Regions:
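N-terminal beta-strand motif that seeds the catalytic metal site of vicinal oxygen chelate
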Residues: 1-17, 68-71, 123-131
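Core segments of cupin and vicinal oxygen chelate
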Residues: 2, 7-49
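Helix N-cap motif at beta-to-alpha junctions
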Residues: 12-13, 75-79
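Short amphipathic alpha-helices within nucleic acid-binding modules
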Residues: 19, 79-84
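Vicinal oxygen chelate
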Residues: 30, 82-131
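Exposed loop/turn and edge beta-strand positions of beta-sandwich/beta-sheet ligand-binding modules
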Residues: 36-38, 67, 103
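Short hydrophobic/aromatic beta-strand element in the GNAT-like acyltransferase core
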Residues: 39, 72, 106-107
Length: 131
């Protein structure tokens, strides 16, 4: 068993697709429905299948992030990722060292609906493993 994808409800599909494309996601499939709703499947380069679904349901009213805390994207170089996102017009936060100097480097960026995305560069020792 494994996680297939997670879905985010978005208020403006065009704006959200532009944001996630700037982050690095690639659109795989778009499914429009007669009621004006749409689903869009995305993945990051290097992923073998869909990892993110954007759900646009205009009839459901305003989008609220609610109890959603964040999701994380592993990056090879946090500095290069921050530079690329900034050049694309996004506003990633300053690098942080939440685990101290030997831990991961992180930064945060927020999507148009307020969903927080953590960008993580693991130290040379790698990501933590759990048995």
């Amino acid at each position: 068993m494994r996680t297939f994808l997670f879905a985010l409800r978005v208020s403006d599909l065009v704006r959200s697709l532009a944001f996630y494309t700037k982050v690095g996601y690639v659109e795989l499939s778009k499914i429009p429905f007669e009621d004006g709703s749409s689903l869009v499947w995305l993945r990051l380069p290097g992923e073998s299948s869909v990892s993110l679904e954007l759900v646009h349901r205009p009839a459901d009213g305003p989008v609220e992030a609610g109890g959603f805390a964040h999701f994380a994207i592993e990056v090879e170089s946090l500095a290069e990722t921050i530079d690329r996102l900034t050049a694309a017009g996004l506003d990633p936060g300053e690098p942080e060292l939440p685990g101290g100097p030997d831990g991961p480097k992180t930064s945060w960026v927020v999507d148009p609906d307020g969903y927080r995305i953590e960008l993580v560069e693991w130290p040379p020792s790698g990501a933590p493993t759990f048995d």
